[in-house]
């Protein structure tokens, strides 16, 4: 997710417009929520070191289901929105989604680069910048 959207973060905030008393969000698919800013910062560090070659998976630290991600978005935005967990089967998508999209970051660890930020911290930074004039 990044500035200007579209993204899951933007979609959740837009859906919490007061017209839906309850949202259902998938709770059985897990990943590493990662901001574009966190990836850009890590990429900048990699580019400073020409000896670092190969494929790098860059994700923020930690993991969450889409449901947990949505709850964190609303909590940090101070939005009172009821969010119920649901199974993937209850939320059909045009293309199947994996239950586990977490990425292994072994190349980053082996490179000696500092770890990327925790996903909750990166989300907080993003929300503070992207929605600074909202309230």
Residue ranges: model-predicted function:
Residues 42, 49-94, 99, 127:
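Mid/C-terminal beta-alpha module of Rossmann-like enzyme folds, strongest
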Residues 16-17, 47-51, 131:
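Residue-level signal for alpha-helix termini/capping positions
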Residues 1-31, 37-38, 44:
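NAD(P)-dependent short-chain dehydrogenase/reductase
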Residues 6-10, 67, 71, 102:
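Short, surface-exposed alpha-helical segments at coil->helix boundaries
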Residues 3, 7, 30, 34, ...:
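Residues at secondary-structure transition points
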Residues 39, 43, 58, 69, ...:
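Non-catalytic, hydrophobic alpha-helical segments
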Residues 64, 99-135:
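C-terminal amphipathic/interface module of NAD(P)-dependent oxidoreductases
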């Amino acid at each position: 997710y990044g500035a200007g959207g579209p993204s899951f973060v933007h979609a959740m905030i837009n859906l919490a417009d007061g017209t839906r008393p309850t949202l259902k969000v998938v709770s059985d698919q897990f990943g590493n929520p990662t901001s574009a800013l966190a990836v850009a910062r890590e990429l900048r560090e990699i580019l400073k070191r020409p000896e670092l070659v190969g494929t790098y998976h860059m994700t923020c630290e930690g993991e969450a289901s889409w449901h947990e991600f949505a709850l964190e978005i609303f909590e940090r935005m101070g939005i009172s929105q009821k969010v119920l967990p649901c199974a993937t089967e209850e939320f059909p998508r045009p293309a199947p989604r994996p239950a586990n999209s977490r990425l292994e970051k072994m190349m980053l660890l082996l490179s000696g680069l500092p770890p990327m930020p925790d996903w909750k911290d990166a989300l907080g930074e993003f929300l503070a910048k992207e929605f600074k004039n909202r309230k």
